[in-house]
Curated annotation (Swiss-Prot):
Name of the protein described by the UniProt record: Toxic protein HokE
InterPro entries: Hok/gef_toxin, Hok/gef_toxin_CS
Keyword Lyase: no
Disulfide bond annotation, renumbered to this chain: none
Lineage, top ranks: Bacteria, Pseudomonadati, Pseudomonadota, Gammaproteobacteria, Enterobacterales
Gene assigned in the entry: hokE
Membrane topology: Single-pass membrane protein
Ranges in coiled-coil conformation: none
Main location: membrane
Example GO biological process: DNA damage response
Localization terms from the record: Cell inner membrane
Family, as annotated: Belongs to the Hok/Gef family.
Length: 50
């Protein structure tokens, strides 16, 4: 029963991330979260289409 809910949670999380990426994909190059003394930074490295 718990595995069923865990699988559903993972699927919802993946769909949320995919949807967010599709919505802001053109402007998503850097994502930064700062909280107190912790900083999380994700940078997207890619080459634009020619």
């Amino acid at each position: 029963m718990l595995t069923k809910y865990a699988l559903a949670a993972v699927i919802v999380l993946c769909l949320t991330v995919l949807g967010f990426t599709l919505l802001v994909g053109d402007s998503l190059c850097e994502f930064t979260v700062k909280e107190r003394n912790i900083e999380f930074k994700a940078v997207l490295a890619y080459e634009p289409k020619k």
